[in-house]
Design a protein with these regions (language model features):
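Chitinase-like catalytic core of GlcNAc-active glycosidases
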Residues: 1-133, 137, 141-167, 193-207, ...
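Catalytic domains of carbohydrate-active enzymes, especially glycoside hydrolases
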Residues: 13-22, 174-184
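Conserved active-site loop/cleft motifs that coordinate metal ions or position small ligands
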Residues: 147-150, 180-186
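Short, low-complexity, polybasic intrinsically disordered segments
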Residues: 160-181
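A short, acidic, flexible beta-alpha connecting loop/helix-capping segment that sits on the rim
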Residues: 187-192
Length: 223
C-alpha cells in the first residue's frame, strides 16, 4: 500500500470504533523493514493532521522490544522515523521480558530491577531523540510517555521469572515516576498452573505459585 492508502485503512478502523488512542506493535523482522517503517510514519502523520483539522485528539503509542539497556537501535529507528515525519508520540510501551543471560544475569530474582532499569533507559532515550528532533519535553512529560509490560511469571527465555514481589517493585516505581502505562503479558496467563506443566512458558498460566489474577490485583492499584 502507499502511505495514502495505509492512512485510509487506519482511518477506517478509527472511524468504525471511535478510537482516540492507537498502538503500533513493531517487533521481529519488521523492525528492520525501513520502507515499511517510513510508510507507516507518513500514514500516522497524516492521521494526526486529519484529526487536528477535525479538532479531535489522536494519541499514538508504540509497543517495542527492550533490554535493560533500553530500546535497540532498530526500535529507536522506528521512533526517529515518526519524529522526522512530525508524529506526536504519546508513549512507548516496552515489552519488558526475554532479555537473555547477558542482559539479565540474575533472571530468577532481579526481573523487577531489570524492568525498572529498562524504563529508566527508555526515559533517557526519549529525551535524546526528542532533543534531536528539536522537541523539548520535561522529565515529567517523558515519564508520562513510558509504558511497561512485563511478562508474568515464567518468561519465554528460561529461567527468567517475573515474580509477585517483582510486580510490587515495579508498581512502587510506576507510582514514584507517574509513568503513562502499567500493563502485563498477559491477563489470560495470570493464574497458577492447574497441574505440573512440561512447558516452561505457557500461554495459559504463569508457571509459578500464585492466586488467580494475583498480578492483576497488584497492578490494578495503579491508575
Amino acid at each position: 500500500k502507499t502511505p495514502t492508502q495505509l492512512q485510509a485503512a487506519y482511518q477506517s478502523v478509527i472511524n468504525t470504533y471511535g478510537l482516540t488512542h492507537i498502538d503500533f506493535d513493531v517487533e521481529g523482522h519488521w523492525l528492520a523493514e525501513a520502507k515499511s517503517i517510513e510508510r507507516r510514519s507518513r500514514a500516522i502523520a497524516g492521521l494526526q493532521a486529519q484529526a487536528r483539522r477535525a479538532k479531535r485528539l489522536l494519541h499514538i503509542w508504540y509497543t517495542l522490544p527492550v533490554l535493560p539497556s533500553g530500546l535497540t537501535r532498530e526500535g529507536l529507528g522506528v521512533l526517529r522515523s515518526a519524529l522526522r515525519h512530525r508524529v506526536d508520540i504519546a508513549g512507548v510501551n516496552i515489552m519488558a521480558m526475554n532479555y537473555g543471560k547477558a542482559q539479565a544475569p540474575k533472571p530468577t530474582t532481579h526481573m523487577g530491577a531489570y524492568t525498572i532499569q529498562a524504563a529508566t533507559s527508555l526515559h533517557a532515550q526519549l529525551k535524546m531523540i526528542h532533543r534531536e528532533a528539536g522537541v523539548q519535553k520535561t522529565d515529567a512529560q517523558l515519564w508520562a510517555m513510558v509504558g511497561l509490560t512485563p511478562m508474568l511469571g515464567h518468561n519465554d527465555v528460561k529461567p527468567e521469572t517475573f515474580t509477585l514481589g517483582n510486580a510490587r517493585e515495579v508498581l512502587a516505581f510506576a507510582r514514584q515516576k507517574k509513568i503513562g502505562l502499567l500493563s502485563c503479558w498477559s491477563a489470560n496467563r495470570d493464574r497458577p498452573p492447574a497441574k505440573p506443566s512440561a512447558n516452561w512458558a505457557s500461554p495459559k498460566h504463569t508457571g509459578i505459585k500464585q492466586e488467580v489474577f494475583g498480578f492483576s490485583k497488584i497492578f490494578r492499584a495503579y491508575g
